[in-house]
Amino acid sequence: MTQRAYNFNAGPSALPQEVLEKAQQQLVDFRDSGMSIMEMSHRSAIFDEVHNEAIALLKKLYAIPENYEVLFLQGGASLQFTMVPMNFLSTDQKASYVLSGSWSEKAFKEAKFFGTPVEAASTKDNQYRNIPALADIQFDEDDAYVHITSNNTIYGTQWRDYPDTGNVPLVADMSSDILSKPIDIQKFGLIYAGAQKNLGPSGVTVVIIRKDLLEKANKSIPTMLKYTTHADSNSLYNTPPTFGIYMLGEVLKWVESNGGVTAVEKRNELKAKVIYDAIDNSNGFYKGHATPESRSLMNITFRVADEELEKQFLAEAKAAGFVGLNGHRSVGGCRASTYNAVPLEACEALRDFMVDFQQKHQ
C-alpha cells in the first residue's frame, strides 16, 4: 500500500486507519448476509441493529441523559442553521447569537428568515482571533435560545467553557469538536454536528436535543424539517445515510476502545501542543492567528512571516506528503486540522518539517 498521507484536511478529514480497514473487510459481505451494508434495506433487522448500536454508544460515550434524544439527520450543519430557528424561533421572538467566526455568521443570517436574531457578543473587530469572554455575552431571559459555535475551523479558536444561560436553551454547533473532549450535555438544549470531522464520513448530521424542547417546537412547518418527525421515527422517517451511520458507529467503537472521550482529549492536547510549540518557539517565523487563551485543539491556524515563503512552505509540505495545510479560501494562510483520528506521529512529522523549513529559510 502507498504510504498513508499526513492528512490535516479540515473536513472531510482523517478517519482511524483501523476503522477503514475493518470497513474494507466487511464491505462486500456484512455480518454473513451476502450483502454490503450499502445494499441493505434500512428497515432490515441487521441495519436496525447497526443504527441502534450507534445511538446507544454515543449516549454512553457522552453520558447523554435519558431526557435527550439522539437523531441522525442529513443536510449537514448548514441545514441546522435553518432547522433550529424554524423549529424554535417565532416572528415575535429574539434569539441571541454569539459571533465567533464565519459559521456563526451563517447561522445568524439564516435565523433572520424566522424571527429576530441579535448579537449576544462578537469578536469580529479582532479578526475573530479570540472567543468572547463569558461576561461579555448579553441575552434576555425571554430569548428563544442562545446559539454558539463551539470551535471555529477557519480562525482556529475554541470555547474552553460554555455560558450558563439559565432557563434559556443553549444551542451549539459542535461540528468540528464534538467528541474531542468531555462536556456536560445538560448545559445544552440542543447540539448539532456534521459527522465529517470527528464522527465519520460526510453525510450524517448528529443532533442531541432535550425532549422538552421537542414538545415546544413549531408544528406548522414542513414534515421533514420538524425535529419531532425524526425523534418519533428513531431517525428512520425516510431512508437514512446507512453507510455513514455504520461508519459513525465504527468510529465510536474506536473511541471507546482507545479509552473513551477523556483519553481522546489528552491525546488531542498533546498533538496540538507539538505544533503550537513549533509556532511559539520560532521567534516569529511562524505566527499563530488565535490568541493563546482561545486556541483550538482541532484547527491550528498560522502564517509564515513572508508571503512568498508561505507559498513555498505549502508547496514543499505538499510534496513531502502533508495534505490539507492550506488555510480556508476566505482567509488564506496555513491550517493544520488535528481531529481525533489524526495520529500523534503526523503532528510530530509536521513539527519536524516546520522546524527544518525554518532552519533553511530564516
UniProtKB/Swiss-Prot annotation:
Cofactor annotation remark: Binds 1 pyridoxal phosphate per subunit.
GO molecular function: O-phospho-L-serine:2-oxoglutarate aminotransferase activity; pyridoxal phosphate binding
CDD domains, alphabetized: PSAT_like
Pfam families xrefs: Aminotran_5
Annotated positions binding pyridoxal 5'-phosphate: 77-78, 103, 153, 173, 196, 238-239
Biochemical pathway: Amino-acid biosynthesis; L-serine biosynthesis; L-serine from 3-phospho-D-glycerate: step 2/3
EC numbers for this chain: 2.6.1.52
Modified residues (N6-(pyridoxal phosphate)lysine): 197
NCBIfam families linked to this entry: PRK05355.1, serC_1
Subunit architecture: Homodimer.
Described function: Catalyzes the reversible conversion of 3-phosphohydroxypyruvate to phosphoserine and of 3-hydroxy-2-oxo-4-phosphonooxybutanoate to phosphohydroxythreonine.
Name recorded for this polypeptide: Phosphoserine aminotransferase
Higher taxonomy: Bacteria, Bacillati, Bacillota, Bacilli, Bacillales
